[in-house]
Amino acid sequence: MTKEEIIEAIENMTVLELAELVEELEEKFGVSAAAPVAMAAVPGAQGGEQQEEKTEFDVHLAEIGGKKINVIKVVREVTGLGLKDAKALVDDAPTNVKEGVSKEEAEEIKSKLEDAGATVELK
């Protein structure tokens, strides 16, 4: 019997038949189909969940690398700064290039800066 055939058989069962099936499976395998009880939130654990759900990122220029001019060009492109301001920003590395951007935009900026020879971190 294939998985598809099993799924089809389950789809054709009534609610009562499904409840009996669940009971028999629980007995046969010694398990419980009951949902696990939610535990009280531990303050330390909450921080880990917030990190996973982070929606805004800072693009941090850690090191310029050997191609400073290329890095300045990319910084100008992604920030809209003029040449003088972009050069000053690159000269101040390590520093944030852009703050509070979406994950997609942050990844794109990181990729461009790394292609230009810089070392970049997302924070």
UniProtKB/Swiss-Prot annotation:
Biological process, per Gene Ontology: translation
SUPFAM superfamilies: ClpS-like, Ribosomal protein L7/12, oligomerisation (N-terminal) domain
Basic and acidic residues composition bias: residue spans: 100-115
Spans annotated as Disordered: 98-123
Record's signal peptide: none
Keyword list, A-Z: Ribonucleoprotein, Ribosomal protein
Primary role: Forms part of the ribosomal stalk which helps the ribosome interact with GTP-bound translation factors. Is thus essential for accurate translation.
Complex and partners: Homodimer. Part of the ribosomal stalk of the 50S ribosomal subunit. Forms a multimeric L10(L12)X complex, where L10 forms an elongated spine to which 2 to 4 L12 dimers bind in a sequential fashion. Binds GTP-bound translation factors.
Name of the protein in question: Large ribosomal subunit protein bL12
Organism: Halothermothrix orenii (strain H 168 / OCM 544 / DSM 9562)
